[in-house]
Amino acid sequence: IPLLFQNLFYLPQSFIVNRDVFNYEFELVRETLFQCLEEAADLLFVDTESNRNLSTTSILSDADLIVVNLRQDTKMLTEFFENHPIIRNKAFFLIGKYQPNHTWNLRRICYRFHIPRQNIGVIPYNLELEEAVTYGRVLQFLNRNIDEKQNKENAFFMRQVDRAVELLHQRIESCQDSRDDK
């Protein structure tokens, strides 16, 4: 897992006084903004709001691939799959704070919501990672555990992250191949 990138840009969310004005102004510059960003980097990740405002809707409709972060929560999963059917074909799902012994495990989620196994990955719950996030030490946690086989919990966590990254990478390559064919 390459942890440092040559070109990694982050456009932070800011306090927006008037969402309607933001959405209007974003639409005016959206196409130019994304063209510039795509010229600067091979991959472009955009973190959107989970609501259906204009900027989120336009970003999702233009996206080649959408990574959807979910939890093992029956109500949340059902609500998502009932209310967002349009993005399913473009989606790669990540189940965060995953617990394999939970009632809604990976197999059940895939079966219930008709998700092909290659379109879903898990990020297991890990207390040590949670502490690293709290203290701003995620990179150190990952670097320390990337090859470590001593700590069983961290080894399981890293295997699952590796698997999720590999599945996501395959989806990205598939999207790039489809784009090249056009």
Language-model regions, residue ranges each:
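Short, well-ordered alpha-helix to beta-strand connector turns
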Residues: 5, 41, 62-64, 88, ...
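NTP-binding/hydrolysis catalytic cores, primarily Walker-type P-loop NTPases
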Residues: 139-182
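P-loop/Walker-type NTP enzyme "switch/lid" segment
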Residues: 1-39
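Beta-strand-loop-alpha "switch" segments that mediate conformational coupling across diverse proteins
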Residues: 99, 104, 108-152
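Short acidic active-site motifs
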Residues: 33, 55, 76
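P-loop/Walker A phosphate-binding loop and immediately adjacent motor/lid segment at beta-alpha junctions
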Residues: 22-31, 80-102
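Inter-motif core of Ras-like GTPase G domains
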Residues: 50-73
